[in-house]
Design a protein with these regions (language model features):
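N-terminal accessory targeting/assembly segments
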Residues: 1-108
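Extended, highly charged alpha-helical segments
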Residues: 105-136
Length: 136
């Protein structure tokens, strides 16, 4: 994840739901982000019982994150949960920064590391399938 030979500064939003092994999942997500070549400029942990269908997280936490990122130099916000297209759009509009989810992060890592033509094509196909769900 490099643009113009400059590492991307990311802000992580780690959502902990009642299900799952929180600590291992969080460590894995942070490792994935670092593997993508980003610099982690900030992290927010969100404990959630019920997901908001418009933004995944509630208004109070959104405001808290927005305040946090306004005082931080970031290029990208990465969520550890999968986002549906409308959530991604709503979050980008609210934060005024690009937002990606865990799936997009993993696809970007694969794209960066693919070496054979076949591998590159397979990754590109997976990326296009993922992006096709974001078309309106």
């Amino acid at each position: 994840m490099k643009t113009n030979h400059r590492e991307i500064k990311s802000y992580l939003v780690i959502i902990n739901s009642p299900k799952g092994s929180v600590e291992n999942d969080n460590e894995e997500f942070i490792s994935l982000t670092l593997s993508a070549g980003t610099i982690i400029s900030g992290i927010t942990y969100v404990n959630i019982k019920q997901f908001n269908r418009n933004t995944l997280i509630g208004k109070g936490k959104l405001q808290s994150i927005k305040k946090d990122i306004e005082s931080t130099d970031i290029d990208l916000i990465i969520f550890n949960k999968d986002l549906i297209a409308s959530q991604e759009r709503n979050l980008e509009k609210f934060f005024k920064h690009p937002v990606i989810d865990r799936t997009r992060l993993i696809l970007d890592i694969f794209a960066k590391r693919a070496q054979t033509n076949s591998g590159k094509l397979q990754v590109e196909l997976a990326q296009l399938k993922h992006l096709s769900t974001r078309l309106v």
